[in-house]
Amino acid sequence: MLVYQDKLSGDELLSDSFPYRELENGVLWEVDGHWVVQGAVDVDIGANPSAEGGGDDEGVDDQAVKVVDIVDTFRLQEQPAFDKKQFISHMKRYIKNLSAKLEGDDLDVFKKNVESATKYLLSKLKDLQFFVGESMHDDGGVVFAYYKEGAADPTFLYFAHGLKEVKC
């Protein structure tokens, strides 16, 4: 199994269990998320409330919860939405920090295409949700999510050059 860690924070953000599609000349990865139901586990502890005079079962109120698989699996933390100014400021800092970690062809491809990828994200800004890794590192990569028109499940966007492949 391959896990993809954020090169800046070390947080696990994705794995090969979630197939991706390349966008913007490979600078962005697009990954489909899915809503899944968690919880509502029926546990039989062997008690017999009717024999003990209890009419109602006073068990734990275990509610089923819907979560997005990627968010839950990698413990992503949702962040407040960015306005255009905040987004551009964040991207400038991210590009600078990530460029320092890249070299050779990776750096060339990233620098050549990151502007178009940023414009692509900027065009969707009002529809984006923002997530960071579990550590909530200030300079870590941001994972973007949005809903395609008519879709019930979110689509996630990652900066491919910001991910480090690790074998588990």
Curated annotation (Swiss-Prot):
Keyword set, alphabetical order: Calcium, Cytoplasm
Chief location of this protein within or outside the cell: cytoplasm
GO cellular component, one term: cytoplasm
PROSITE patterns (alphabetical): TCTP_1 (PS01002), TCTP_2 (PS01003), TCTP_3 (PS51797)
GO molecular function annotations of the record: calcium ion binding
Residue ranges of every copy of the TCTP domain listed in the record: 1-168
InterPro entries: Mss4-like_sf, Mss4/transl-control_tumour, TCTP, Translation_control_tumour_CS, Translational_control_tumour_p
Annotated localization: Cytoplasm
Protein family per UniProt: Belongs to the TCTP family.
Function: Involved in calcium binding and microtubule stabilization.
Annotated protein name in UniProt: Translationally-controlled tumor protein homolog
